[in-house]
């Protein structure tokens, strides 16, 4: 599947491949490493069920290591949208830009809470502060961001000062985040 996708990308097609996270990251890792990481073929991988969201299908569908595996392969962008609205923005961006090979890690399940409205202004590679705070800095990625936002909003309402940043793009890393960390 990755070989065919790479060939299509080499011929100029905009290519999206979707499968469960462990199959894209582990079973196809050599092809991903060679064709996407080293040869930089512009293929977008959409990984379903990262983490334990597909646990009801058994441990063969757990995508626990996918992020570590993809981060070990040079040259691959990594996105982890927090909700469906953000996923829509990510896919729109990948359809309209040539970002190079990209791994989109989907961690949500049907019925997951939303973080963003549909008019949210997504920017690839730029971290998104979701709350204001000056004492504690929290980073979140993927569908757990909605839970973090809910908890931090409640804590801030009773006097805490917590800033939550959504890490929707895990590679490339937004260099401004280092300034955020230094300021805390």
List the predicted regions and their residue ranges.
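Active-site-flanking structural segment that lines cofactor/substrate pockets
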Residues: 1-7
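Short helix-loop-beta junction
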Residues: 147-165
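Short, catalytically relevant binding-site loops at active-site mouths
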Residues: 110-111, 144-146, 169-172
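Residue-level signal for short, function-critical loop segments
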Residues: 21, 49, 142-144, 168
